[in-house]
Amino acid sequence: MKIKNSLKSLKARHRDNRLVRRKGRIYIINKLNPRFKARQG
């Protein structure tokens, strides 16, 4: 999982990326291609 300050560019890397908010953190998840997972930090 990548940890980035800004997720907007990471979200654009794949069209199946979803922005999800869990426990106050913002994540990008991708069910089809899990290598695009990221967390804002």
Swiss-Prot record:
One term under GO cellular component: ribosome
Alphabetically ordered keywords of this record: Ribonucleoprotein, Ribosomal protein
Pfam families named among the record's database cross-references: Ribosomal_L36 (PF00444)
Highest taxon listed in the record's lineage: Bacteria
Keyword set includes Metal-binding: no
Gene Ontology molecular-function annotations: structural constituent of ribosome
PROSITE patterns cross-referenced by the UniProt entry: RIBOSOMAL_L36 (PS00828)
Keyword Zinc among record annotations: no
GO biological process, one term: translation
Recorded family membership: Belongs to the bacterial ribosomal protein bL36 family.
Name assigned to this protein: Large ribosomal subunit protein bL36
Lineage: Bacteria, Pseudomonadati, Pseudomonadota, Alphaproteobacteria, Hyphomicrobiales
